[in-house]
Amino acid sequence: MKDPSRSSTSPSIINEDVIINGHSHEDDNPFAEYMWMENEEEFNRQIEEELWEEEFIERCFQEMLEEEEEHEWFIPARDLPQTMDQIQDQFNDLVISDGSSLEDLVVKSNLNPNAKEFVPGVKY
């Protein structure tokens, strides 16, 4: 449907609507459409910095994973063969309590000393 105000066959030109070379007459700066480029270097620097940061974080995670795998695969206590001296030291570290602490344990015990010995699978 046509607009009745524009019923004439020739287009009406109003001074405010005239645009020359993509700019209206009111536009004082002929380079306004290129103003987005003003901060292009700062934008590029910021993006580059973010990319470097992401790469650094990725490398850190990769190194952490590699270290974790190295430690996971090699556990000295498990993977190295023990020498006789180490085994002897472990046996010497085992403490067999002396009789005095055993007597204290018996005095404080609630067990019946006259009870039958427990044998698995035998019903009394």
From Swiss-Prot:
- Report the sequence similarity comment from the record: Belongs to the PAIP2 family.
**Would you tell me the protein name for this molecule?**
Polyadenylate-binding protein-interacting protein 2
Record's subunit section = Interacts with the second and third RRM domains and C-terminus regions of PABPC1 in a 2:1 stoichiometry.
The molecular function terms of the Gene Ontology recorded here are:
mRNA binding; mRNA regulatory element binding translation repressor activity; translation repressor activity
Q: Which gene encodes it?
A: PAIP2
Query: What biological-process GO terms show up in the record?
Result: memory; negative regulation of translation; negative regulation of translational initiation; regulation of long-term synaptic potentiation; spermatogenesis; translation
Q: What is known of its domains?
A: Only the PABPC1-interacting motif-1 (PAM1) interferes with the binding of PABPC1 to poly(A) RNA and translation initiation.
UniProt KW Ubl conjugation keyword: yes
**Modifications made to the protein after synthesis:** Ubiquitinated, leading to its degradation by the proteasome.
Residue ranges of the TM segments? none
- Top-level division of the source organism's lineage: Eukaryota
